[in-house]
C-alpha cells in the first residue's frame, strides 16, 4: 500500500460507516476498501496496522462538551470564571463552586456473591428502581472543603435554600462568597424573593457574588470535577434509599475533607486565548 492509498483508507475510517452499520470493523473496512477500488485486495490485518500507525480507533467514541465557534457570549463567561479562579485564598471572600446532579436509587433483588481467590465478585443483572434523588455539591477548592446535600428535587426553592445554607451555615463569617454555577433557570437570584421575605432575601444576596459558566461550558465548573470523583469513589454501586445516599455522601465528603483533597486548576485566560482561539470572534483590523 502506497502513501496515497493509505491516506484514502484513513479518510474512509474517519467517515461514517455504510447504512446498516453503527461503526467500522476491520473486516468491513477491508471489504469497503476493495469495493471502492482503493486497492485490489487487502486483509483485515493490514487494515489493523494502518489504524495502529495512524492512532485511529473507530470502535471507540467519546462524549464531549462541544462549545460553539467564535462566540463572544461563551468567551465572556469563560474569561470571567477563569479570572475568579486566579484569586488568592481569602477566608473572608471564599470561592465556592456549586453544581447539581440526579442520582438513581437502585436496590439489588438478590444477594451478591462475594469475591474469592481466583473469582470476581458476582452480582445479578436484575435490580429494583427506588426513585431518583438529587445531589447538590458545594466545593471550595481553596479551602479544600466540600459537602453534598441530598434532596428530593432540584427546584428553585431547593436552590434558594442551598444559597441560604451557604451564607448562614457553611460560611457565616464570610463577607462575600463568589459562587460559580451553571446557567440554569433555577439558578436565578430572583428565586430568593419567591422563597424568603424581602429582608431575608436581600441579606443573603448581599453576601453572594454569582459567576455563571457559559452555556455548554460546564467543564469550567470545578464542582463537576468533584462530582466525577464522587461517582467513581462512592456512587458506582447500588444505593437503595435516600437515607443511605445521605450517609454515604456525608462520609465521603468528610473523609475527602480530612485528606485536604482539592483540584489544582491550572488553565488560565492566557492559555484559553491560545488553545481555544477558535472560540474567539475574529476582529478585522
Can you say where each PLM-predicted feature lies in the sequence?
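Active-site proximal helix-loop segment of RNase H-like, two-metal nucleases, encompassing DDE(D)
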Residues: 146, 215, 223-242, 255-259
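Short, basic alpha-helical nucleic acid-contact segments in DNA-binding proteins
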Residues: 49-62
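Extended, low-complexity cationic-aromatic segments
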Residues: 77-164, 276-277
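RNase H-like polynucleotidyl transferase catalytic core
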Residues: 122-127, 200-222, 237-241
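A short, amphipathic alpha-helix used for macromolecular contacts
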Residues: 1-42, 88-89
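Short, basic/hydrophobic alpha-helical segments
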Residues: 157-178
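Acidic/histidine-rich, metal-coordinating catalytic segments
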Residues: 174-188
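C-terminal domain-tail junction helix/linker
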Residues: 109, 244-285
